[in-house]
């Protein structure tokens, strides 16, 4: 994840030091949380509040060139209104029609509920060899319905997806239905559960999605 600005519009990114166990491995750009009063990586299915985005590497092993690599503090970009971005996840089609797409096995979370991906946007990235899909790369198609049974995405009418056609998958704005990847550095649609991270922006030119904390350790609570 790359911090880009704060929700108020200011681009100055604040980072503060927090305690971390000397042996804990964290990379810059990783989503982190507090556990036992110390910074640890966020879980793939992060539902508890996050602290922010790690602002530096902390390998957890001694490094003569970087005394902080196994130090007892780490910098975290911790503004509750921090907006951060990651590469957009991609899926491949297994089959489809002029108004539907069935993703390849494992590309979409099998446990995602009906309508979980409604209002998402698919952008054709590339076509498989021999594909008869009439859409051109870059074509955007909104998801109008999602059915868990068969993992069927209903789309705005367009070309027929062929097996192997690759699409960028932009989650619906305001949704928190994805999961974090194993390194907690990006969102994936192959799993669900990271309810603490919400998608709030699509950058089709840079092929990224923008996110914000849906639950933050420093956010005011009523």
Spans of features found by a protein language model:
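Surface-exposed, low-hydrophobicity beta-strand/loop segments enriched in small/polar/acidic residues
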Residues: 1-222
């Amino acid at each position: 994840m790359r911090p880009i600005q704060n929700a108020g519009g200011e681009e100055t990114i604040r980072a503060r030091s927090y305690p971390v166990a000397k042996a804990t491995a964290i990379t810059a750009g990783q989503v982190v949380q507090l556990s036992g009063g110390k910074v640890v990586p966020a879980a793939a299915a992060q539902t508890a509040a996050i602290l922010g985005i790690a602002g530096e590497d902390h390998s957890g092993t001694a490094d003569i060139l970087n005394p902080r690599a196994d130090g007892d503090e780490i910098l975290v970009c911790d503004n509750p209104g921090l907006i951060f971005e990651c590469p957009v996840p991609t899926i491949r089609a297994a089959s489809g029609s002029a108004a539907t797409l069935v993703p390849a096995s494992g590309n979409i979370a099998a446990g995602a509920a009906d309508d979980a991906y409604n209002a998402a946007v698919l952008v054709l990235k590339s076509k498989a060899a021999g594909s008869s899909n009439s859409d051109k790369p870059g074509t955007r198609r909104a998801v109008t319905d999602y059915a868990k049974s068969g993992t069927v995405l209903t789309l705005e009418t367009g070309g027929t997806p062929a097996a192997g056609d690759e699409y960028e998958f932009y989650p619906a704005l305001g949704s928190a239905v994805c999961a974090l990847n194993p390194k907690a550095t990006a969102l994936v649609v192959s799993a669900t559960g990271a309810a603490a991270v919400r998608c709030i922006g699509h950058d089709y030119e840079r092929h990224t999605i923008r996110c914000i904390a849906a639950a933050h350790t420093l956010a005011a609570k009523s």
